[in-house]
Regions:
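Acidic, glycine-rich two-metal-ion catalytic cores of nucleic acid-processing enzymes
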Residues: 192-221
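N-terminal leader/targeting and assembly helices and adjacent pre-domain segments
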Residues: 1-195
């Protein structure tokens, strides 16, 4: 029963995480489209010149990188987008930390109940009754604190996370340019970076739930 409940709670959490990154993805897509839209006419003009043989492929790619990848506005865009993704990661970590104490509590209580149910009455009298009560929120949090070595809370190091996301956004843009993506496709590449963050959050949630489940059971002994 505790396994089934834990899995159900994990599915609920994963849905919440999906909503977080879906919203972030929409916002990033809008920012990227607005940014690239400002250069659409210039892009069309330069692309036509490139097609006419006035530029080599490397020269055209260099122009694109100067426009999109290295300019001040491009840097500001990536900084803004990276911070938005880091904000989503912080929200995801908070959701995970909010749920794991309850997973600890239920698995702790269920394990304690199972231990008691398997003990002979004589042994229970010798060692004292094992109380089976649902742990309230405050007790659960205290239990989590005591078990931090087993189950440390999820934390997002903001500056490190922002740097990581900026690098991934830059790489996505570079790959798009090298592969000759249209402006629309360039904007869409940023969604892949959102997907990376979403995947990492799901992985963190599953790891945290497994740790909470095991930690709760161990605490019953």
């Amino acid at each position: 029963p505790s396994d089934k409940w834990t899995e159900q709670e994990l599915q609920k959490l994963e849905k919440r995480l999906a909503d977080v990154y879906k919203q972030a993805g929409k916002e990033l897509d809008g920012k990227a489209r607005n940014y690239f839209k400002q250069f659409s006419r210039r892009y069309a003009k330069e692309y036509a010149a490139y097609q006419a043989g006035k530029y080599t492929k490397k020269e055209f790619e260099a122009w694109l990188m100067n426009q999109y990848g290295r300019g001040q506005r491009g840097e500001a865009l990536r900084e803004d987008m990276a911070r938005r993704l880091t904000e989503s990661n912080q929200i995801a970590a908070a959701y995970i930390n909010e749920k794991t104490p309850l997973v600890i509590a239920l698995n702790h209580n269920f394990e304690a109940y199972m231990i008691k149910s398997l003990m002979p009455d004589k042994q229970i009298k010798e060692i004292g009754d094992i109380a089976f009560n649902l742990v309230d929120e405050h007790t659960v949090k205290r239990l989590t604190v005591r078990k931090q070595k087993i189950l440390p809370p999820r934390r997002v190091l903001k500056s490190k996370d922002v740097r990581w996301n900026k690098k991934k956004l830059q790489n996505a843009l570079l790959q798009g340019i090298l592969q000759g993506d249209s402006i629309k496709k360039l904007a869409g590449r940023f969604r892949d970076v959102t997907g990376m963050n979403h995947t990492a959050a799901i992985r963190n949630a599953r790891t945290a739930f497994t740790g909470a489940q095991n930690g709760g059971r161990q605490a019953a002994y």
